[in-house]
C-alpha cells in the first residue's frame, strides 16, 4: 500500500517494553480468555497494564504468564508491520479500542505467529531484543458494577481489575 494515511500518533514508546506489552497481552488472552489490557502505561523503567478478569490469578498462574512471555521473547520472532484497509483486517484483530475517527488505513503489528493487532507505536525488530521479562508486582482490585466492561459473549464476566507491573532486564542496547 503506497503512502498510507494514518492518524497522528504522539506516543514514543520504549520499543522493547512496547513489544513486550504486545506479547503479554496475547499471553493473557490465551491463558485467561480475557480482552487485551484495559489500559497500558509503557515506560523504559517499568510498565503497567490492567486486565478485567473474573478471578485474581494465582501465584502459579502469574509465574506461568512470566514464563510464557519469556518463551516468546527467547524464540526471537520477527516483529513486522503491514498497512491494510479496514475491510482487510483479519477476524482475530479486535478494533474495539479504535477511536471513532481512526483512518481507513490501519497498521497491523505482528509478533511472529504469536500476536497481531492494530498499532501505531514503535517496536523492536525481533523479540529477543526485548531482553528478559520480569513481573515486578501485581495487584487485584474488585470492580464495582458501574465500572465493568461488557464482556464478549465467550468471556466470563469480570469481577476485578488485575494490574501487572513489569520490567525488562538486559534489553538490546540499540534502543
Residue ranges, per PLM feature:
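Active-/binding-site microenvironments in catalytic and ligand-binding cores
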Residues: 1-175
Amino acid at each position: 500500500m503506497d503512502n498510507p494515511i494514518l492518524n497522528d500518533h504522539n506516543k514514543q514508546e520504549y520499543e522493547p517494553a512496547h513489544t513486550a506489552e504486545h506479547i503479554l497481552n496475547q499471553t493473557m488472552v490465551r491463558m485467561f480468555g480475557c480482552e487485551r489490557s484495559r489500559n497500558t502505561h509503557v515506560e523504559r523503567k517499568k510498565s503497567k497494564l490492567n486486565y478485567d478478569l473474573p478471578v485474581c490469578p494465582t501465584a502459579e498462574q502469574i509465574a506461568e504468564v512470566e514464563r510464557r512471555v519469556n518463551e516468546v521473547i527467547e524464540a526471537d520472532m520477527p516483529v513486522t508491520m503491514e498497512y491494510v484497509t479496514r475491510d482487510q483486517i483479519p477476524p482475530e484483530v479486535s478494533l474495539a479500542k479504535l477511536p471513532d475517527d481512526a483512518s481507513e488505513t490501519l497498521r497491523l503489528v505482528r509478533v511472529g505467529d504469536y500476536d497481531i493487532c492494530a498499532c501505531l507505536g514503535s517496536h523492536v525488530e525481533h523479540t529477543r531484543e526485548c531482553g528478559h521479562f520480569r513481573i515486578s508486582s501485581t495487584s487485584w482490585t474488585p470492580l464495582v458494577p458501574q465500572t465493568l466492561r461488557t464482556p464478549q459473549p465467550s468471556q466470563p464476566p469480570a469481577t476485578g481489575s488485575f494490574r501487572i507491573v513489569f520490567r525488562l532486564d538486559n534489553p538490546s542496547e540499540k534502543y
